[in-house]
């Protein structure tokens, strides 16, 4: 597993979980630092070869390269301006996540974790963000994916309607508020405004329901939380 996150000053951190090894690549004084299972490896000790697993970590140009071809990872590279992930040929079609299946197919590349396809690249990218379990954990993003209600009423099939997104939208956890947002276009399923159906019933299986219209919604990209969250 390769995971990427931004810290509170928008610097990128990469975490690689491969075999039983945990590798962290992170910004350090204008360069890239590296930790293996929580222990920092000094630059003068690179290249590093793991004693039991075929993993090599070395300096490459202005960044750090992690190579483990026997485990499916051709290279993970990171420097202060860029990052990339490459898998070996025999992993093509077996991957998932932000980079897709790596099989060259382009018509179904925007498949979200729930199995549904989206037409929107931003919605697709957001769908692969790991939801936080607690708003008190500073190492997590403090956001979750949720269906949202369209703020305005819409007229659908001649009826005033309430509409709910069939695609998940990033939202801050309870007790937190957004400090950075972006606009995304998502599909909405609508029910008559005077319907007796309550919100929980509408949201049950919402991601498989028909799309009645597409509208913009605010996605929360960064959140600040109260001490009592």
Swiss-Prot record:
Listed name of the protein: Vitellogenin
Entry keyword Transcription: no
Lineage: Eukaryota, Metazoa, Chordata, Craniata, Vertebrata
InterPro entries in UniProt: Vitellogenin/Apolipophorin (IPR050733), VWF_type-D (IPR001846)
Residue positions the entry lists as glycosylated: 198
Tissue specificity comment: Expressed in liver, ovary and, to a lesser extent, in muscle, intestine, skin, kidney and heart.
Any single GO BP term: cellular response to estrogen stimulus
Keyword line: Glycoprotein, Storage protein
Function: Precursor of the egg-yolk proteins that are sources of nutrients during early development of oviparous organisms.
């Amino acid at each position: 597993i390769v995971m990427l996150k931004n810290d509170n000053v928008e610097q990128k951190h990469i975490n690689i979980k491969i075999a039983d090894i945990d590798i962290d690549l992170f910004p350090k004084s204008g360069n890239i630092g590296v930790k293996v299972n929580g222990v920092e490896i000094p630059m003068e000790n690179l290249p590093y070869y793991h004693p039991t697993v075929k993993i090599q970590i070395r300096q490459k140009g202005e960044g750090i390269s992690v190579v483990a071809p026997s485990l499916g990872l051709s290279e993970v590279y990171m420097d202060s301006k860029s990052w990339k992930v490459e898998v070996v040929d025999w992993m093509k079609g077996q991957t998932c996540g932000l980079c897709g299946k790596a099989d060259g197919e382009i018509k179904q590349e925007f498949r979200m974790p729930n199995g549904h396809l989206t037409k929107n690249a931003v919605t697709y990218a957001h769908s692969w963000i790991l939801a936080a379990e607690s708003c008190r954990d500073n190492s997590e993003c403090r956001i979750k994916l949720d269906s949202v209600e369209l703020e305005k009423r819409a007229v659908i099939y001649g009826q005033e309607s309430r509409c709910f997104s069939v695609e998940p939208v990033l939202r801050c956890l309870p007790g937190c508020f957004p400090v950075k947002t972006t606009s995304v276009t998502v599909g909405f399923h609508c029910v008559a405004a005077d319907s007796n159906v309550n919100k929980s019933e509408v949201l049950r299986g919402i991601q498989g329901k028909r799309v009645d219209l597409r509208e913009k919604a605010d996605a929360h990209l960064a959140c600040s939380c109260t001490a009592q969250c």
